[in-house]
């Protein structure tokens, strides 16, 4: 414990938190409290988060459970926006200005991995069978733009940030037999066994149909979330991601592009990115020296790009948590900066 205490104190001092040129920056009590919190973080037991491993006795290409293998396209339609190859599409005339607005020197950031602050890192999903019992959801924020029908929420559903998470608390549920996707934002199990959520959306994955114009979903842009996640099974087992990814920016434009149906911005300035905007990694960007999983992600960004889906941190790429990720390898994509990306030509912008 003494060693840990010394390491933490060194880190705090190195960050200029103890004193600077003789001027006390923090009281002893504040420093002690921060050290205690850091020691707890370092010494606490690793959180438990298990995903469904491949079941050789289940012949279905889509298996059951949390983080289960999905060995088929979520949207099978070749013309679906998520499946579109955008590697040859023209660059938008305003690309450089938009990239600069988001952050030309800001890195790509994998918003997924093993654990972060004691909780699974990423947006979790679970696959259920068609006979999974459905339960009503009490929508208390965006009920007028939610699909008000029962949702097949399993017992102890995985929630973004964990059971006590304070963030977006997304929960994604895929019905493999009816091929429908149920997504919830700010899901909160109640003491009586019922559920509350801010919003919810149901997507028939057999169709290209989007949300009604002007409607949100469990995501700000009105898009489904699961089709845009970096998943372990695709990256490490199938070794190829064949769809666009989801990403966030700090501030967006008061506009959206299909397949998005909703905006979450206030500015109408042309250098602010609209929801549904698509960017790709430059074709001449050399990915050969990156770890295998990072190469899979970067090649996906060159061919399919990523779609702006929510406000958040700059260039945060969304994915599903999995204890099998090697965080050091996925974090290699941080070497990619905003200036290495380009906005593809935007058409049919709506407000």
Regions found by a protein language model. Name each.
Residues 3-16:
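Hydrophobic membrane-insertion alpha-helices, especially the h-region
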